[in-house]
Design a protein with these regions (language model features):
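Beta-lactam-recognizing serine transpeptidase/beta-lactamase-like catalytic domain environment
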Residues: 2-10, 79, 224-234, 270-326, ...
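Periplasmic/cell-envelope proteins involved in peptidoglycan metabolism and beta-lactam response
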Residues: 1-298, 308, 320, 342, ...
Length: 449
């Protein structure tokens, strides 16, 4: 009892009040800090945090527009669309994209699947836009992703339309192919509508009419769960398909020309003489445009691009060759137009044409005998046109050649056309420093040289 009284007798009210004040200040400061932090998060960072929260719950999923169907002159489809199943990852939904790729590689084991790793730009600039890791995967490969979905947060399967070229190599150079936009494509985009991941025409009709064929993409606002899986669609904007295109090409005639060129290098162009419409345009060797749907490995592309037979080149447009005997029509027109010959003018062909000490042979070694213009054209007599070309002269031949459209673009609806060369005396002097010689005229009179 005395001990208890002794304890109370030592109690100091002033000391207690000081401790209480210190405790109150600690509480006040703590509450002030907490209040200011809440104010900062709610007011200063509120919009940003709400956006982050929304991005973690809502994804904007782009719905690709179908490209227009391409048909031949008879309405037969030669290019269609088909679904492609792509494996993508939402960079902002995972801690480390590299870890996700390693899990995928472990799942697929030795099946040869390759996944893109250049995700850095997407992670930084578009963290909630799916980034494609693999394109056009098979049903079996797709099933593995679905089976291991719990191990793959942020990984989604996109269904996108890709091109199906029904003729394969046969129409490759006319139609071209579609591929993913490159940095150069984005920099050169005048419309401002392209973005990373878009697919555009890279060559042929696909490139020439790309904006007409492409259409406008739509989109879905979808709610996702904690592992990035779709829960429901909140809103959908339907895509607008591209326009269909009908070509002048006849698919059946194209097939005939393609088979006739089997094992050969060169091109075939067939035009309708009634209106100049191109019914056939074949170039061999060629490439399969369907290979670009999956994304071509750099080694495979290098092999294709450096092939000495140039399968990527449309030889009907880009190849530059001597016109050969077709040029004899130009020589005949020049001779008639300048009054140098008439249809009844004859020359004697014994199989040779002599110019000084040089001999120029006719394809018919025994010669054609005495022939007029009509027979010279029918039998393609070289000697007849040697004579006419020499009399007309190179500069007049060049003038008539240009009137026929030689040396100028045809205006065909395909990219990559290269114009031919019409030689003149001035051109040779400028190019080689040597004067034009009569023998040069003899060679070009039959479309050679």
């Amino acid at each position: 009892m005395l001990e208890k009284q002794d304890r109370f007798s030592r109690y100091d009210p002033g000391k207690f009040r000081r401790r209480f004040r210190v405790l109150m200040w600690i509480v006040i400061v703590s509450l002030s800090l907490l209040t200011s932090r809440i104010w900062y998060l709610q007011v200063v960072k509120g919009d940003e945090l709400r956006s982050q929260s929304e991005n973690n719950r809502v994804r904007i999923h782009e719905v690709k527009a179908l490209r227009g169907i391409i048909r031949d002159i008879h309405g037969k489809a030669i290019v269609e669309n088909q679904p492609s199943y792509d494996i993508s990852v939402v960079p902002g939904a995972v801690k480390n994209v590299g870890d996700v790729i390693r899990v995928l590689e472990a799942i697929y084991g030795n099946q040869g699947m390759e996944f893109r790793r250049d995700v850095s730009v997407s992670e930084k600039n578009r963290p909630f836009i799916p980034f494609k890791l693999a394109k056009n995967v098979s049903w079996e490969e797709l099933a593995l992703v679905e089976t291991h979905s719990l191990d793959l947060p942020g990984v989604v399967v996109d269904v996108v339309p890709v091109r199906k070229y029904l003729g394969g190599e046969m129409t490759a150079h006319v139609l071209g192919y579609v591929g993913e936009v490159s940095p150069e494509d984005l920099n050169g985009d005048q419309t401002g509508t392209l973005k990373p991941g878009d697919r555009i025409g890279k060559s042929g009709i696909e490139k020439y009419l790309d904006e007409y064929l492409r259409g406008e993409n739509g989109g879905e606002y979808i709610e996702v769960n904690a592992v990035g899986r779709k829960v429901k669609t909140l809103r959908r904007v339907e895509p607008i398909p591209g326009h269909d295109v009908t070509l002048t090409i006849d698919a059946e005639l194209q097939k005939v020309a393609w088979e006739a060129m089997d094992g050969k290098v060169g091109s075939v162009v067939a035009m309708d003489p009634r209106d100049g419409a191109i019914r056939v345009m074949v170039s061999r060797p060629a490439f399969d445009p369907n290979l670009f749907n999956k994304g071509m490995h750099p080694d495979a592309w290098k092999k294709l691009a450096t092939d000495p037979m140039r399968p990527m080149e449309n030889k009907a447009l880009s190849g530059q060759y001597p016109p050969g005997s077709t040029f004899k029509i130009v020589v005949a027109a020049a001779g008639l137009g300048e009054g140098i010959i008439t249809p009844e003018t004859t020359f004697y062909c014994n199989g040779l044409f002599r110019l000084g000490n040089h001999e120029f042979k006719c394809w018919q070694k025994k010669g054609h005998g005495r022939i007029n213009l009509h027979k010279a054209i029918v039998e393609s007599c070289d000697v007849y046109f040697y004579n006419v070309g020499k009399m007309v002269g190179v500069d007049k031949l060049a003038e008539y050649a240009r009137a026929f459209g030689f040396g100028a673009p045809t205006g065909v609806s395909l990219p990559g056309e290269r114009c031919g060369l019409i030689p003149t005396g001035e051109w040779k002097l400028r190019k080689t420093g040597e004067p034009w010689r009569p023998g040069d005229t003899i060679s070009i009179s039959i479309g050679q040289g």
